[in-house]
Amino acid sequence: MTLTIGLTGGIASGKSTVSAMMRELGLPVIDADEAARAVVRPGEDAYRQIVAAFGPGILQTNGEIDRAKLGAIVFNNEEERKKLNAIVHPAVRQKMLAEKEALVRSGTKTVVLDIPLLFESGLTSWVDKVLVVYVDDDIQLRRLMERNGFTEEEARARICAQWPLAEKMKRADAVINNNGTREETRRQLLAILKQWDALEK
């Protein structure tokens, strides 16, 4: 029986760090952001639908979708954003589920689904255990400003667009506190995975 772990957190909470640690431990990680990039590549169904919906003006000279141009169209326009999400979200879900099913069929002991918006997208039914990566608000804000070059106002707006981390923690099966060092984070991760019997013997 395969154990499916849903890995999530807040923006700049250190989820990617934990995801990388899980890969290092030999766990297969299916990443929602990677899937979202894959489904909009030239030749994919979602790519064709996006070009049909938004016109060839969103393409770069090499035929790939210009994410900045598309982003500018959908960022401040709720209707356009809904139109894009209605194309991309089902394609991403289909891709992730297909990858998960293939791993389950091959008898993999544990599969990790790395989904930033696990709760917001209502996908908790996909997983057996939810692992939330947490940091204090001030650290989250500082990391986001440093990492993305955001002003404090921009960083706060990005954080507020997601569920509060405190709410995610309440619904989690386990929480990793990522305020400290990488080693402290790794220790917590190992303890949780051992408790869940998630690692190959």
Curated annotation (Swiss-Prot):
Family: Belongs to the CoaE family.
GN (gene name): coaE
Principal EC category: transferase
Residues reported in the UniProt entry to bind ATP: 12-17
Catalytic reaction annotation: 3'-dephospho-CoA + ATP = ADP + CoA + H(+)
Ranges annotated as spanning the membrane: none
Protein name per Swiss-Prot or TrEMBL: Dephospho-CoA kinase
Record key words, sorted: ATP-binding, Coenzyme A biosynthesis, Cytoplasm, Kinase, Nucleotide-binding, Transferase
Domain DPCK: 4-201
Molecular function as annotated in GO: ATP binding; dephospho-CoA kinase activity
Metabolic or biological pathway: Cofactor biosynthesis; coenzyme A biosynthesis; CoA from (R)-pantothenate: step 5/5
Intracellular or extracellular location(s): Cytoplasm
Main location: cytoplasm
Xref: Pfam families: CoaE
Keyword Transmembrane: no
Biological role: Catalyzes the phosphorylation of the 3'-hydroxyl group of dephosphocoenzyme A to form coenzyme A.
GO biological process, alphabetically ordered: coenzyme A biosynthetic process
GO-annotated cellular components: cytoplasm
Organism: Geobacillus kaustophilus (strain HTA426)
Keyword hit for Transferase: yes
EC number: 2.7.1.24
